[in-house]
């Protein structure tokens, strides 16, 4: 039986030490034989469902990341059974939790149960169309979001082209889609290879974007809209602090906070 309830304390007792050696970043995680080590992407989903929010990589809150609860042995190895970098693809594809750049413009996971509160806080009471009508978003973001009125999911390269980014067009595609993820309007639904003219996959897997509404439905995503956004934010901070009680207010703001 996995004992997630005190995983934060387990990390503090059993984690390997992160260091810079010969100019290279050494991952910080749990020892291979640590009973608290997460051993599969399915286990990682279970933990995300329990705690609600989880960045992919270590940050200012000790233990608050997938990195610190997995082994450092197989990162970027390409082994689908052991590599947490591969797991993120399976998790995004599963649709059981949300994956995207939600934490300080960096990647992480949010449980389905908590996503409506996250959306209510980050959207600040506005659906995207309402935000546009009020003059609160850029035309670049409007061009991106307009594409999802026609198709539920889009490869990053498709979205970039359709939204008018690239040579001679709009600039800062990556920054724009990151801001939309931070705002609760987009997520990464999958990672897929491109298809050649014969329909055969090739190359590295590419991010596939979608709206949270396409994943879980408008009514579900909007189910916390009756709450004040500030209250949703307070509950999210409280939830993270409950699982990581050593987190300071400053650290919480750095990892969770966002100034539009």
Regions found by a protein language model. Name each.
Residues 2-260:
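Long, low-complexity intrinsically disordered regions
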